[in-house]
């Protein structure tokens, strides 16, 4: 994720020495508490029952950029050693790309040199770094009262009813503010798990107290930057803001949010627009939804091609798979949104500092 | 749109001297025919009946980067003078931001210095430059047989049934390959127009003959780059690839596309994934859908705030508005997709040139 | 010149329709006076006697990004139409690259598609755009009291003695604060002119009131960014800061500038370091020197190769050449320095806005 | 160093856990031999007698991006753990910035949060990462026969006579191809060392077999990109190409290099231009010179300011300092040049792959 003033680069492979992140542009003076960072990483493990059995402690090692408990302003590098990787299995399926996975296009892209073990650099394990980036970004946003929270909006056929931002931020349930919907989501995931299958879902992410004026037209469009960040998360196949695709079915008179005065400030009566108009934040809550496809690794037999012999074969995967990755995606989605917001906030401060 | 090797910057304002584009990174030797470029620009005007009455000839003036009918390899600048702008009206509504428009957040973003006339730099008129960028990108892609085409997938409640890529590229109808659906779309737009309202829709864009291996994980993700480009188009509120949001309702066993051998090459039996896995093209047709909200400018009365007096007022817009911008968005969507593909193709060629 | 928050792109060819510039990232609210801009452009014409006889009015046409006399915050495009170009001559020398010019490598780089007339995109005429960029950057810097001024430090064997910043900024002579040296420089240029030759020189540029803290180590190094900008000016072959190459001959004990307290602030007693330590400004005047090679276009006969026949031939140039480009380089050097400083100042403001 | 297709970011602090590098854009299939990499790192230690007594084994740990002995095409991270750091001393001088060092401006830049121990992120130790980047870049260049070599051109008053590229590449002396000059350089460094002082110098770097056509005008200028990279090396205060600053004293008729035919190819008779004209390589050897100031850390007493009490004090440094860093700069200079060349080579291949 390369912002103008804030960017990060993920490194590492699922079965290599480590995974990690290098963050550039973090301002100095952000307080860093490893326990807090670990708590965020813990969220990334999702609901144990529906997650891969690979369970590592994910101990973040801060290699650079933090001194005496605060960011220094120079590049921050954090890595997490890999410990519990079992690569033996991947040699078996090296020539039989898994449907729905990057195996085949990656082989083409990297001329066969890529580390194919456990998905290599494509592995969901790389999101460890994303969550760490989010940790720093959230700390920066907190200074301005900006908060970001994601919840599961859908698992397969089960959709959570629309919730108001206040409800969401007040909810004690870390996955979904609607307990009833959450129960049914769990059932859906369980059904998928039991049948050796997987299931998709959507995540809704909300950011509050975002000031108006972040973003801009064309190259500065904050929706475009957010979408760009969110699509980089593995398995994401759709992103929408506000009413998103539902706008396509509407008339302008229904879709437009009237401007009103609330507590002496400009606001909109409804928030169909999801907090962004013309690529710029309006001061209303930012609302986006992200579609995740079902994990492609499933236990059911699938058809694929043996790339050496160029014939079609049946593939039966063994290993430790998530039956649903949506619960573990929550902190990852939040991290991407927080990071983009932090970049745009910094850009805003640059202008505020010179426009008189 | 800033790619790694290919980027463009739009400039101009709706009621300023001109709108235009500067393109960097175009390789030398692309043949440029102004008539072809104009034909593309003509498509951008959409269906006359449902488009703004502002009708300009959109004569592209190539200012730099083209010599003897070919690109030179240095920055290409093309501009189109504005002629038919009527700004008188905009002074009236200067302090009453139009609902659904960028007026209010733009005023915050630009500290009140933005050119508010006709939407200024936010105007749909700026897409003139996008279409010009697309013209060059398509010419480059053509050398490799890559073709990009967009069609209207939905207008309000009317959805075009799924079409196969071959059908689409063979269709004589420039808006929608399904004549029956198109008829009903026209009716829908007419209804909106007559009631002084506007209507939204979706565009589906397909690219064929895209080689496998473009894109990459994380920072090189081609879906992210495409989404980033598409969200920069005004009024876009959602982007999805392949089955997109429908993936969220599915099981992995339904969603995964089996790999097969077709004509001695690796392909997938179905194309749920829309041509990209793990951020990398698979060689299958690239398929994306883009949601457009209804044009916010409507003739029906709306509520807004007078920013000077900070009280709520009724707003009745006069002017020349599109009742539906979806038809004119087609070449814009194609242009964005073509441009991103061209950037990734160039990056691919860099690696092909050094990996031995 | 691509900075993080401020960048510009030059476009146009010497004998094409126009030359111009697109500037991105300029904050809104910078007052623009065309007469001031023209005065800067006038400086770029140098001393009439030693400059090309091509004399155009260089009327800047502001195409975008300025509204009601102030920058809007969106991309600023300014162009200057070409009027007095005589291309007939260039067909003659198309296959015989001029020694010291980009003709030959440009032909290779652009696969023969480049506009070779008058140097095309390589022409010194493109510095029109640089000067315009400098105009905006200087206006921004002025708000913070930062001023940039360049003077001729050397023409051939004649060197101006070191001057103090105060002297320089107070000098009425626009080329060199030392009248005696300037007289001898003029003689040197005249001698070169009369013999159908050209002569090189150096420019020293000084910026005062630059706050401490701009720049940073490695990727943020402001000397590197300044050098990068300065080397983009045609004919520049060397850049140095402070004592520059003289440091190589020195001992640390001579070279180090002692820190002292001046008016209650930290300063250095001497300014050998030229205002930058470790890539960061110290608050002392920024001092850089730039070496310009003699204009390669001379009237004396030269040897070159006929690229078609691949044999060696004599080349006698006709045309209108500068006998010395150093005088006209002054506003160009200032512009590059001002632009880089403005970019770093913006970045600084971003951090100042969030570090608490 | 951020190129268009190839970039690296250094991380770490002198007395932190580690120093290292993350490289993005390296193509897959580059063979990696740790012993070769260590040999390059060994060169970075310079001549033992004149280098800091901190002697670490500099064992590179390849964390990511290399699989089965070849680059994978995903980000390469290499780190070297810090072992022999003694930080106790730095608390003493925390408030008394060392003359010639970044201590003072760094404190301003980072609002006091920077790791000041051993220079922190400004430490020469960070060049470990640069050398590693150079290792990869050189391997890529080797495929095309491109070789880069640097030598000491000057130490204080002692200058090595000009050498031809063939001589340089054939020389067995790793520091200077002229044995006599090298002897005198050693004496000069010894004199500085004995007097508790340090001495500056210049490095000349030469690249051979660079194809014509790399680089371009303005934003693509390869001299600008090289200078930008070279100025990022600590202590560099000047960069010049070909005759560099000597051009300023010359006439065009002396300076211009006649084009000639050599072995059926276009060449120049002389190489005053140093292999680049108009920002583009000409096919002649690339020649640049880099000025290094004397190491600011010396044992002689110096004057500085106590930043807390704001009064002037005498500073006597203790610690382990280089009396001359020029010998250890050689692989660092080579690395920067190789890296920039590799980036431009990749860009060239992109165009070669599409221009027909």
Swiss-Prot record, chains A, B, C, D:
GO terms for biological process: amino acid biosynthetic process; aromatic amino acid family biosynthetic process; chorismate biosynthetic process. Keywords: Amino-acid biosynthesis, Aromatic amino acid biosynthesis, FAD, Flavoprotein, FMN, Lyase, NADP. One of its GO terms (molecular function) is chorismate synthase activity. InterPro entries: Chorismate_synth (IPR000453), Chorismate_synth_AroC_sf (IPR035904), Chorismate_synthase_CS (IPR020541). Gene3D superfamilies: Chorismate synthase AroC. FMN binds at residues 121-123, 278, 293-297, 320. Reduced FMN (FMNH(2)). Pathway: Metabolic intermediate biosynthesis; chorismate biosynthesis; chorismate from D-erythrose 4-phosphate and phosphoenolpyruvate: step 7/7. GO terms for cellular component: cytosol. It holds the Pfam family Chorismate_synt. It is an enzyme of class 4 (lyase). Its EC number is 4.2.3.5. Its cofactor is FMNH2. The keyword Flavoprotein applies. It catalyses: 5-O-(1-carboxyvinyl)-3-phosphoshikimate = chorismate + phosphate. NADP(+) binds at residues 44, 49. Belongs to the chorismate synthase family. PANTHER family: CHORISMATE SYNTHASE (PTHR21085:SF0). This reaction introduces a second double bond into the aromatic ring system. HAMAP family: Chorismate_synth. This is Chorismate synthase. The gene is aroC.
